[in-house]
Each structure stands twice: as C-alpha cells, then as structure tokens.
C-alpha cells in the first residue's frame, strides 16, 4: 500500500482523488490544468542524512530519495536500481554532477555545481535520461501481454527554450512505442541547441520550428494537453518541467553537492543559487529542504524576464507584455510553469489550514485569474512564507557578460574557467549575495546548468578580447563539432497556432514506423 508521499494530486483539484506515480508520469499534466504533487513530503532525520546518506554514491542516493516517492508495488527495488544505473551510465563524469570547489582564489566559499556532463551537455539530462527509461519501463510492462494491434503507444509533446528539447530527444530516441514532438521558437535558440535536436535520425523523433516565442510554444503544448479528444486519440505525454519525474530526479544533486561542500558534516551552512526560468530546478531544492536537508536559503537568479523576482518582492504574479531576448535564452519566459507547485504548498500552509482540497481551490482561482486578467495578487502571508525559503536576484545582460569575463580572468581552480550565460547569471547573483552576507562561513553552491559550448555567441562576445582565448580550442567538445556536418530533420510551423501543430503531429505520426 503506497504511503502519502507516493500518491499524487493536482494543484488545482478540490477533490480528494489521488493517482499513482505511474499515472502522474504518463499523464504529465492533470486534466484540470494543474500539476501533480505528492500531498505529503517525506521527512528524513538528521542522523540518516549525515550518518548514512552522506556516504552514498550519486546513484545510491538517487535510489534512497526516489524510493520515498515511488511505491515498492509500482517499481520494485531491483528495477528502480536498474533504471537509475542505466540513466546515469550515459554521463561523462563518474560523479554525475561534480562540484568544482573554490573556483576563484578570493572566495573560498563559492562552489560551482556542474550539471552538464550528460549526453546533451545540459542539466536537463539528469532528469530526462531517467524519464526516458521510466516511459519505456511502464510501456513495456503494460504491453507485455497485449496483442500487437492493442499495444499502447505514447506521443510525447514538449516545448523548449533550448536545452529541454535536446535532452528529451536524447532521453527518448529509439524508445519502443514512444514518439516525440518538440516545439521550439524559430531563431530563438542557439545554433548548437538546434543542431542537437534536428540531427537525431531516429524515426520516432520530430522537431517543429514554430514562428513565435517559447511562451507561444508552451501555450500550444498546454492547449494540446487540454484537448481531450486529441489527447485520448494519441495518448499524449509530457516531458517538460511540468512532469513530476523531472523534479524528483533533480533532488539528488542538492543532497549530493551539499554533502560534498560540507564533507558530510551538519555543522556547515549552505545556500544554493539557481538560474531560474520555469522554476523546476530550484523547486527540487525546495523539496530537498522540506525533506530535512538543512539548506539555509534557496536563491532564485533571474535575467531580465523577472516574474519570480517581482513576485517575491510584491506578491503580484503578473505576465509581462513581451519576452525580453537575453543572453540566457533558456530563461526567457513570461510564465514560470512550475511555480504553481510551490504556491499549492504555501496556500495549504498559510491560507487553507492544512486542507489539501481548499489549497487546490485557492490555486485554481489564482490561475483562472491569471488566464483572465494576466495577473493575480497573493496574500502577504504567502510572500512571507516564500521568503522563509527563497530570496531572489535579477541580473542584466551586461552583468552576465561581465561575469563570464571576470571568472575567466580570476579563476584559479581551474584556471580560465568558462561559464555559460545561464551559469553566469547564477554566479553574478552568488557574488552579490556573498558580498551582502555577514556570515562569511556560509558555503554557496551556484548551479551550472549548461556547457558554455552551447552558447557560442554570448561566450565569444564576453571573451573575444583575450588574446589566448579560442572557442574551438578552449570550449567546443569534439562531439559537438561534428553536429554541423549532419543532416537536419525538422518541420516549420508558419505561425503559433495549435491547429497547425496538431495537424503536423498527425501527419508525422502517420509516417512514423514505431
């Protein structure tokens, strides 16, 4: 019998109904438009954390965490261990997410957590390698005893502002009974990101280049999930950051890096700084903190698309008129899709007296208001509640570029360390927070979300003044150099229209030989 942290409910539901882990993963988005969450966050005591978990490998730690959220009846121990082992065998680092400590000589408490050692050189591989294997595991089990004509197939539809698309494609390419459609805004992702997605030859993969913004693409995906007829006909699944399995998989590196930065001792204080757009990455840190990991604070680092920074300062969640194109395009969003999950827990604690159903009703009302008016205002208690766990910093394009330059010049471990622009947003915010912090013993872990090679223009613009710098020699891995020579496979969608996208998906599904 699953416990309360192994069943899931919608953030917008005022019904007591819960579903299984498998249903939450395959379905992705709730039919009422809400996101799936465990109503109870499991607790881990300090003795277990520092006597046991601190000594575990990344893979064993992932198993210990995931076991708390996945019932044994759904995935037995041996199967879960195998899924985890296969998911992280594709990484270039034995540690999976290594921590580069004391990067600059002058700040011994600034550490960079490298999350880009997976197949697509982005943090999203940590989750999407696991999600791809999960989808295949559930489908194979479902289809094992079904005749050929009745086997279940999943159509994964996702939107990307850059890295999610390639990570999803690499996680799902060649998987049996899964077809993948990734939408991205034409001309708004880096050339390498586009090449990574469009050069995958597997028949079950198709990229759709949409005239418009990332938010247009995300709105289309949400509309497809809300279309019951299309959804039912094609069994649509989600791998965007709304999929609960992605949040779950990302929790591991908060625990793992915390133990590295503190040598497994509970006496040191740690703050995490996370470049944030859709809020999925930092939300995993929130779950780690609520489970018992003694994180002092989670700092949201935003670029000029600063809905999260504005919310924490005012309590007003307001969609801007347009997206600002920045040097950190994966964070160029108007609406932060995972923020709804945090709002549910805050609403339950501060407005609903611990009532799950009431919390769902409150969140649903907020998001209906957002849909109608483009904004909603929350009670002061919600801002105060959020501020207990979160702080935020907004970083400009100029500061992003300056930080890439500064770290290249000042880094000693290793020398000439190169940041991608998203990581630079985080490091700039980190340095600001360190300067403001009276307690100089606090360790700061700044999350590095992508390899600098994926953002050549931003990196080159920042570093072109250094005579000894060469993008080809210092930054670009051999594997990524080859991409430009490969044949591209993509379909253009002339305007951001859900019907055009649905038609394109159906045309391609008819051609695919799954």
UniProtKB/Swiss-Prot annotation:
Its EC number is 4.2.3.1. It is an enzyme of class 4 (lyase). It catalyses: O-phospho-L-homoserine + H2O = L-threonine + phosphate. Keywords: Amino-acid biosynthesis, Lyase, Phosphoprotein, Pyridoxal phosphate, Threonine biosynthesis. Pathway: Amino-acid biosynthesis; L-threonine biosynthesis; L-threonine from L-aspartate: step 5/5. The modification Phosphoserine is found at residue 467. CDD domains: Thr-synth_2. Disruption phenotype: Threonine auxotrophy. Leads to accumulation of toxic levels of homoserine. Sensitive to sodium chloride, lithium chloride, thermal stress, cold stress, high pH, UV and 5-fluorocytosine. Decreases survival time in an in vivo model of infection. The modification N6-(pyridoxal phosphate)lysine is found at residue 124. Present with 26000 molecules/cell in log phase SD medium. This is Threonine synthase. The lineage of its organism: Eukaryota, Fungi, Dikarya, Ascomycota, Saccharomycotina.
């Amino acid at each position: 019998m699953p416990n309360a942290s192994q069943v899931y409910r919608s953030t917008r539901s005022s019904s007591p109904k819960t579903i299984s882990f498998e249903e939450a993963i395959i379905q992705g988005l709730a039919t009422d438009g809400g996101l799936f969450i465990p109503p109870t966050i499991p607790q881990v005591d300090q003795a277990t954390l520092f006597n046991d978990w601190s000594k575990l490998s990344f893979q064993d730690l992932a198993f210990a965490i995931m076991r708390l959220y996945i019932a044994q009846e759904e995935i037995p121990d041996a199967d879960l261990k195998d899924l985890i082992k296969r998911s992280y065998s594709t990484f270039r680092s034995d540690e999976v997410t290594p921590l580069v400590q004391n990067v600059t000589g002058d700040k011994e408490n600034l550490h960079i957590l490298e999350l880009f050692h997976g197949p697509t050189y982005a943090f999203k591989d940590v989750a999407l390698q696991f999600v791809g294997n999960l989808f295949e595991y559930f489908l194979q089990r479902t289809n094992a005893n079904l005749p050929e004509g009745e086997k279940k197939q999943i159509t994964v539809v996702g939107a990307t502002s850059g890295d999610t698309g390639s990570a999803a494609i690499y996680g799902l390419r060649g998987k049996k009974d899964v077809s993948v459609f990734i939408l991205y805004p034409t001309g708004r992702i880096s050339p390498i990101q586009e090449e990574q997605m469009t050069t995958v030859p597997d028949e079950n993969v198709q990229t759709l280049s949409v005239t418009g913004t990332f938010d247009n693409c995300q709105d289309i995906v949400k509309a497809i999930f809300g279309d019951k007829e299309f959804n039912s006909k094609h069994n649509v699944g989600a791998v965007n950051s709304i999929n609960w399995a992605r949040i779950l998989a990302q929790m591991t590196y908060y625990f793992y890096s915390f133990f590295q930065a503190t040598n497994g001792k509970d006496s040191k204080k740690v703050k995490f700084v996370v470049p944030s757009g859709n809020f999925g990455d930092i939300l995993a840190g929130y779950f780690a903190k609520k489970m018992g990991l003694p994180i002092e604070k989670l700092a949201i680092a935003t670029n000029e698309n600063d809905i999260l920074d504005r919310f924490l300062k005012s309590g007003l969640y307001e969609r801007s008129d347009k997206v600002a194109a920045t040097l950190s395009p994966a964070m160029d969003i108007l609406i932060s899709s995972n923020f709804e999950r945090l709002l549910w827990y805050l609403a339950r604690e501060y407005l609903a007296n611990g009532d799950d159903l009431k919390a769902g009703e409150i969140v649903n009302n907020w998001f209906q208001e957002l849909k109608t008016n483009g904004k909603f205002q929350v009670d002061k208690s919600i801002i105060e509640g959020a501020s207990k766990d979160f702080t935020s910093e907004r970083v400009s394009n100029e500061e992003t570029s300056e930080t890439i330059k500064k770290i290249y010049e000042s880094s000693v471990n290793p020398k000439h360390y190169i940041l991608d622009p998203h990581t630079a947003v985080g490091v700039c915010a980190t340095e600001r927070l360190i300067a403001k912090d009276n307690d100089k013993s606090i360790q700061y872990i700044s999350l590095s979300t992508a390899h600098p090679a994926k953002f050549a223009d931003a990196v080159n613009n920042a570093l072109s003044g250094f005579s000894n710098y060469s993008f080809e020699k210092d930054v670009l891995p051999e594997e990524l150099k080859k991409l430009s020579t490969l044949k591209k496979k993509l379909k253009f969608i002339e305007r951001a229209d859900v019907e055009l996208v649905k038609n394109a998906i159906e045309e391609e599904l008819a051609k695919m030989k799954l």
